[in-house]
Amino acid sequence: MKQFAFPKYERLLKRSEFVQFTNARQRIHTAHFILLWTHTEDSTLKIGITVSRKVGNSVIRNRVKRLVREFYRLNKSRFVMAHYNIIAKKGAEQLDFQRLSRELANVLERLHK
């Protein structure tokens, strides 16, 4: 069961950690998400989730973040060791978990090509 955990050391929490993505050239766009990633020298896997107010009110934004966290938790082994920031675009609030999972799984497949 611990393999499906999402401990604090796997999260991007500080502003300075998110700022490293400002000039990230490594990005993939989909209809509802933007995935930014940077390889780091410490070879750790960390993820940050960004949902702006354009997506909806706080209840909706938190739901989108919960769904993305759940996708990460269940598919952690498919991520390469790097730091990721998943940004939700307007319209992501309309996705259910299956459609969100399909879209993010396609992103990971494109990432590994």
Curated annotation (Swiss-Prot):
It catalyses: Endonucleolytic cleavage of RNA, removing 5'-extranucleotides from tRNA precursor. GO terms for molecular function: 3'-tRNA processing endoribonuclease activity; ribonuclease P activity; tRNA binding. SUPFAM superfamilies: Ribosomal protein S5 domain 2-like (SSF54211). GO terms for cellular component: ribonuclease P complex. Transmembrane segments: none annotated. The keyword Nuclease applies. The keyword 4Fe-4S does not apply. It comes from the Bacteria. Consists of a catalytic RNA component (M1 or rnpB) and a protein subunit. NCBIfam families: rnpA. This is Ribonuclease P protein component. It comes from Geotalea uraniireducens (strain Rf4) (Geobacter uraniireducens). The lineage of its organism: Bacteria, Pseudomonadati, Thermodesulfobacteriota, Desulfuromonadia, Geobacterales. The gene is rnpA.
